[in-house]
Design a protein with these regions (language model features):
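Non-catalytic accessory regions used for complex assembly or targeting
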Residues: 1-85, 91, 99, 107-126, ...
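Short loop/turn segments at strand-loop or loop-helix junctions that form parts
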Residues: 92-97, 174-175
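Short acidic, S/G/P-rich loop/turn micro-motifs used as interaction or catalytic elements
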Residues: 97-101, 157-159
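"Short basic amphipathic alpha-helical interaction patches in structured regions
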Residues: 105-112, 164-169
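Aromatic/basic-lined ligand-recognition segments
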Residues: 131-168, 183
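Solvent-exposed, flexible loop/coil residues
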Residues: 146-148, 177, 247
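Compact mixed alphabeta submodule
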Residues: 155-197
Length: 252
């Protein structure tokens, strides 16, 4: 059974876990908490050091077991997230066999959306009324168990976009309420955006991706930010979101 962890718990009990889990968490800590302070996501770095983040380990994302484990972890996380701190985020590490590690980035993207589709099918709670059903609406966000999440995916196939590279498949689920003070309408949010973009330019070997915009911006589509390309290519305006699980609901 998958378990939800705090950093403080993992620091004390890491050696009791499987080797790949030890390696994943260790490498995450080295990346986010690097001594040179280069990791571009400042809120994520703050959340790591303040123990606001929660962690989970699941199986290969291509299997049904991973979907079931992720569903249970997100249910548990939804019940405690607001008590973890202002930089809350759930970090999920996926077991990543060698054959998957060697896959092209397109395969990872396909598997990412397949996982979200299958995860939605496990959802027992109605889609929140305040979140649009259409992914192409600028206020759409992925939801599970009644909670809206901004999601980002990192993979071994991301090479140039170092900020999205990780030796295992890793997904971060950030509750939408985290951004109530951290958005384009607040001075704090504006300053943070400028700082993160500056750090991204120094960290990645490609420019800041053009899809990275604020939630609520009429030109923004959250789904395009979930899985970024390894280059500067932006999906065309006519591109359709791979998440189609809500199609029938939209027709009602």
């Amino acid at each position: 059974m998958a378990q939800l962890y705090a950093k403080s718990c993992l620091d004390q009990n890491l050696r009791s876990l499987e080797e790949w889990k030890q390696d994943a968490f260790t490498q995450f800590g080295e990346m986010v908490g690097d001594e040179a302070d280069t990791f571009p996501c400042v809120p994520g770095r703050q959340g790591f050091f303040l123990d606001h983040l929660r962690y989970g380990f699941v199986g290969d994302l291509r299997g049904d077991g991973a979907v079931n484990e992720l569903a249970e972890l997100l249910k548990e996380y939804q019940g405690c997230a607001k008590q973890t701190g202002q930089y809350a985020s759930f970090i999920c590490f996926f077991e990543t066999p060698q054959d998957l590690k060697e896959s092209p980035i397109e395969e990872f993207e396909q598997q990412f959306w397949s996982l979200l589709q299958r995860l939605h099918q496990k959802d027992e709670v109605p889609w929140p009324a305040e979140i649009p059903l259409d992914p192409h609406h600028h206020e759409w966000e992925y939801c599970f168990h009644g909670e809206a999440y901004f999601i980002l995916c990192s993979t071994p196939a991301h090479k140039l976009r170092k900020s999205r590279h990780f030796p295992y498949v890793m997904m971060a689920f950030q509750p939408r309420w985290v951004f109530e003070k951290l958005n384009g309408s607040t001075k704090f949010g504006q300053k943070m955006s400028q700082l993160v973009r500056k750090r991204l330019k120094a960290y990645d070997q490609v420019d800041v991706h053009p899809s990275l915009k604020w939630y609520g911006d009429p030109t923004n589509h959250e789904w395009k930010q979930y899985f970024l390309s390894d280059d500067e290519a932006e999906k065309p305006a006519s591109a359709k979101c791979p998440f189609t699980a809500l199609k029938n609901m939209m027709k009602l």
